[in-house]
Amino acid sequence: MKKTSFLIVGKHAVLEALKNPSRKIERVFLTEDAQKKINRENQSLNLFKKVSVFFKSKKELDNLCGRDETAHQGLIAEVEQLEEVTLKEFVNNNKNNNLNIIALDEVTDPRNIGSIIRSAVAFEIDGLIVKERSFPAKSKLLYKSASGGVEHLKIFRVSNISTTLRFLKTKDFWVSAFDVEGSKDFTENKWSGKNILLFGSEGFGIKRKLLENSDFRFKVKMSHKIQSLNIEFC
């Protein structure tokens, strides 16, 4: 395997990568049963035409994936990273006056990040800001949880979230922090204009400095019996 390539697993993650012309795919490993099922479900698409395909048994795929990793569903692909656009380039070149971008403060669990990516695509969020040092960019768990969403969402890796938010505020973005002590119900906001939706880590929430520099603090209404939700459900 190339030094720059990595493995992604799972039906939706691999199929969406195959459909993405911007994604370079080195090889695909799959069982014969998985290929038959995929061809039946995608009869109008010849998804394997331009890639090297290697048929493997389920046990061989288990070994390739790693026993402690996520279920592969009979399908694994060796891929390269997508070419990235920097956040600065995206903001400066985008003429849309209505943008919603999620920013994550020290959220590190790959399953949670993958679920956030999947939800962001479903709700037509325009991008995701993550801290480069703690972002598991090549995680099989992240790709599996995202169910192909990585292929459809701009992910901006930055060195410092606080500095990034200050820059975005100079570009007319409003920063809205989601916090248990928020004073406003997020469902009552129209979310027009340019917005940054800031979420904190699973264990510690949003850093105080980021909260102090936010324009708004929103809460998610819940039963009084439960104090907090996992980040992936927010």
Language-model features, listed with the residues they occupy:
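Short amphipathic alpha-helix with an adjacent loop that forms part of the alpha/beta core around
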Residues: K88-K95, F167-K169, T187-W191
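Active-site/ligand-binding-proximal alpha/beta "capping" segment
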Residues: S176-N230
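Structured adenosyl-cofactor binding patch, chiefly the S-adenosyl-L-methionine
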Residues: N20, E26, A122, Y143-G149, ...
